[in-house]
UniProtKB/Swiss-Prot annotation:
Binds 1 Mg(2+) ion per subunit. The keyword Zinc does not apply. Keywords: Hydrolase, Magnesium, Metal-binding, Nucleotide metabolism, Nucleotide-binding. Substrate binds at T131, R132, N133, E134, G135, K136, S194, F277, G278, Y279, D280, K300, H305, R306. HAMAP family: Non_canon_purine_NTPase. CDD domains: HAM1. It holds the Pfam family Ham1p_like. Pyrophosphatase that catalyzes the hydrolysis of nucleoside triphosphates to their monophosphate derivatives, with a high preference for the non-canonical purine nucleotides XTP (xanthosine triphosphate), dITP (deoxyinosine triphosphate) and ITP. Seems to function as a house-cleaning enzyme that removes non-canonical purine nucleotides from the nucleotide pool, thus preventing their incorporation into DNA/RNA and avoiding chromosomal lesions. Its cofactor is Mg(2+). The lineage of its organism: Bacteria, Bacillati, Bacillota, Bacilli, Lactobacillales. GO terms for molecular function: dITP diphosphatase activity; ITP diphosphatase activity; metal ion binding; nucleotide binding; ribonucleoside triphosphate phosphatase activity; XTP diphosphatase activity. This is dITP/XTP pyrophosphatase. InterPro entries: dITP/XTP_pyrophosphatase (IPR020922), ITPase-like_fam (IPR029001), RdgB/HAM1 (IPR002637). It is an enzyme of class 3 (hydrolase).
């Protein structure tokens, strides 16, 4: 029978694992780091009563990422329903209603911070998504749940005021929303701002994408306005454009985390496709000849500016959180 090989790899972390006859860890770095990893690995596997798990650490930046990888391997291979939760700088591993393992960083954590709340609903780290869209929230809840983080949205805070997006750039708008809501709630907040940039129009509609044809414009009206602006641009190569997304995570007393991504393409001459929204029916993806509205949801999520930005965020978020 073929032995399963598990792997996680991004720019910051790279782990490989398999199951054999005994627990074993390898790491070809400095001795001090190796000793720390061995102590951690032995403590976790012994506590979870795991045998035969073999782990190789190639690159490591995030204890959370490493624990999540190990638990994913155990879940897939052994069917264990293990969950990691972040709480006040520690990592808690549980199964069902039982707390099995606590990982504390070398510098320790504040006892008052760790035990300060008697309210079970306050237990664990929380990320507030600056949206009322339940579909978007569901996707982020799935992603951050793997990092042991509870996700809420603005529907959980009905009394919060609306934050006007008055910035001149995507980052300014995303920062404004995330940092304002973080100050008001004391929570860690994720916000995004996205739009379409057409090169020959100097980057327009840009931050005004949703209201290009007016404050209450519909998608159809915005698309018609864009086609009108490009009516005299006959050379397809000069109709280049990109969708852009900026994501900002803000938290009290921290420097905000910023990631962004572009999805390059061209503006077509007529709407095509029934999927998506906004400018999707006009946006020709790369050199495929297909509009974003002709892609399936899965295809779009894999390629799009938002999908790329979220991938970047999930790679750098654990390291950002550990630095604070």
């Amino acid at each position: 029978m073929t032995k399963s090989i598990f792997e996680y790899k991004d720019d910051q972390d790279w782990y490989l694992a398999s199951f054999g006859s005994y627990n074993h860890l390898t790491y070809f770095g400095d001795d001090e780091a190796y000793e720390q990893y061995v102590d951690f690995f032995q403590g976790l596997t012994n506590t979870l009563d795991v045998s035969g798990f073999q782990l190789h650490v190639v690159k490591h930046s995030s204890d959370l990422r490493l624990v999540s990888f190990i638990l994913d391997c155990l879940k897939e291979e052994l069917g264990r329903d293990l969950v990691v939760t972040q709480h006040q700088g520690t990592l808690l591993v549980s199964e069902g209603d039982k707390l099995l393992y606590v990982h504390v960083p070398r510098e320790g954590v504040s006892l008052d911070g760790f035990f300060g709340s008697d309210n079970k609903s306050d237990f664990g780290d929380v990320l507030l998504i600056a949206t009322r869209n339940e579909g978007k929230t569901k996707e982020f809840r799935k992603l951050f749940g793997k990092l042991g983080i509870k996700v809420e949205n603005l529907n959980d805070y009905p009394d919060l005021p609306e934050v006007a997006e008055t910035g001149m750039t995507f980052e300014e708008n995303a920062r404004l929303k995330a940092e304002t809501i973080s100050k008001l709630t004391g929570k860690m907040v994720l916000s995004d701002d996205s739009g379409l940039q057409v090169d020959v129009l100097g980057g327009l509609p840009g931050v005004w994408s949703a209201r290009f044809a007016g404050p209450e414009a519909t998608d159809a009206e915005n698309n018609a306005k864009l086609l009108h602006e490009l009516a005299m641009v006959l050379d397809d190569s000069k109709r280049s454009a990109q969708f852009h997304t900026t994501l900002v995570v803000a938290a009290p007393g921290r420097d905000s985390l910023v990631v962004d991504a572009d999805w390059k393409g061209y503006i077509g001459r007529e709407p095509k496709g029934d999927n998506g929204f906004g400018y999707d029916p006009l946006f020709l993806v790369g050199n495929t000849g297909r509009t974003a509205a002709e892609l399936s949801t899965e295809e779009k999520n894999e390629q799009s500016h938002r999908g790329q930005a979220v991938k970047k965020l999930m790679e750098v978020f654990p390291a950002w959180q550990n630095k604070q």
